[in-house]
Amino acid sequence: MTSDFIYPEAQSIAGVDEVGRGPLAGPVVTAAVILDPKNPIIGLADSKTLSKKKRMALYEEITHKALAWSLGRAESKEIDEINIFHATLLAMQRAVNALGIKTDHVLIDGHICPILSIPSSSIVKGDSKVPEISAASILAKVTRDREMEALDKVFPGYGFAQHKGYPTAFHLEKLALLGPTEQHRRSFRPVRRALISLTG
């Protein structure tokens, strides 16, 4: 990974990223990672640019080599209650608070930082610039993808294992035909529209 990003002065830095803001179903999942400079991981990149095989290999390496890592989440009902923006910030807070060791600075992918008790910075496209954020993006994506594949077995017919809850044509078709599950986000327009259509 090559980048002109300049790190803040800090002894311990955590990277944070999220996966799952756009889907119509399932949680938004976040991860926080503190890498070990003495035990580097080669090949870190934005999780969306990696093959599933490469993501899985890096997931195993990150969870074994990182000084600390943790996950956060906000469920569909929380997303409906406080909206996806605030739910994402809440999930990021949860991930940072769950880290087992102290960090001096948090680098967060995107434009806005959640309220934290430690200094933080938002980095636009941070998942392609900052290894710690890249690692967090990989952990969050692998975790959420696995959950959606498991959800596919609980609610067969929606294709969760394939589209992971995103609004593909197939998902929208099945949503209109079968109606929303308990994991669908009712505050999202396509889900609300399907619900109204089925209930009259």
Curated annotation (Swiss-Prot):
Gene that specifies this protein: rnhB
GO molecular function, one term: manganese ion binding
Stated role: Endonuclease that specifically degrades the RNA of RNA-DNA hybrids.
Domain RNase H type-2 residue range list: 11-200
Cofactor: Mn(2+); Mg(2+)
EC number, UniProt record: 3.1.26.4
Family: Belongs to the RNase HII family.
Top-level taxon of origin: Bacteria
HAMAP family, per database record: RNase_HII_B
Keywords in alphabetical order: Cytoplasm, Endonuclease, Hydrolase, Manganese, Metal-binding, Nuclease
Protein name: Ribonuclease HII
Any one of the GO CC terms: ribonuclease H2 complex
Keyword Transferase: no
Catalytic activity of the protein: Endonucleolytic cleavage to 5'-phosphomonoester
Major enzyme class: hydrolase
Residues reported in the UniProt entry to bind a divalent metal cation: 17-18, 109
GO terms under biological process: DNA replication, removal of RNA primer; mismatch repair
Naturally occurring in which organism (per UniProt): Hamiltonella defensa subsp. Acyrthosiphon pisum (strain 5AT)
Cofactor note: Manganese or magnesium. Binds 1 divalent metal ion per monomer in the absence of substrate. May bind a second metal ion after substrate binding.
